[in-house]
């Protein structure tokens, strides 16, 4: 098994296979769930809009993969600073049956100097998720924060407020995940001593098996070769799946979208 084959198999099992498009339909979500079950193993999760959670749950159960988790998004993609709305959306996602919620951090408020609203918003969503045994991932939108100090600060605030994962991006802005932002966020997890309890998710722009291998190499370097398992690492992607399957000798994987 080559290094690329090994990293591709790892990456596939760490994928949150994603469709977050305005034209998503039940049929597209059903197709996504089918894609999540591959000849070389299942993806960790599918990531979809909240209204599609019931059809995704039904499809995953019917195809014999009830262990594929369902992630969804709230306060998305804008990252506004209205805590009541973010919390209401998160509670609604939980009521739909989400296993995991990816909430967007109010990154523009942080850029304007307000650190408190980000903490309060994440904490409110975390409290709701914790009560329902739902995992909370916090999207800090690194491509908009841009500066290392802001990426670091948003990561730290999210972790202090209870994030189970910190995630780079919505996939809806010009610059999404980059190896540089991944390194900063992984360093925060390491430096805060929370590697046992906090995971990391690069999202948007991780499109090839080679891309995935580079991201995993950074995690292995900073946090050890055994750290990046499904409880601590996810890839938010869709087109990546076809590339991983090709690297694993199962070509013709068709992706749901360009995320």
Curated annotation (Swiss-Prot):
This is Deoxyribose-phosphate aldolase. It catalyses: 2-deoxy-D-ribose 5-phosphate = D-glyceraldehyde 3-phosphate + acetaldehyde. Pfam families: DeoC. Its EC number is 4.1.2.4. GO terms for molecular function: deoxyribose-phosphate aldolase activity. Keywords: Cytoplasm, Lyase, Schiff base. It comes from Cronobacter sakazakii (strain ATCC BAA-894) (Enterobacter sakazakii). Belongs to the DeoC/FbaB aldolase family. DeoC type 2 subfamily. InterPro entries: Aldolase_TIM, DeoC, DeoC/FbaB/LacD_aldolase, DeoC_typeII. The gene is deoC. It is found in: Cytoplasm. Pathway: Carbohydrate degradation; 2-deoxy-D-ribose 1-phosphate degradation; D-glyceraldehyde 3-phosphate and acetaldehyde from 2-deoxy-alpha-D-ribose 1-phosphate: step 2/2.
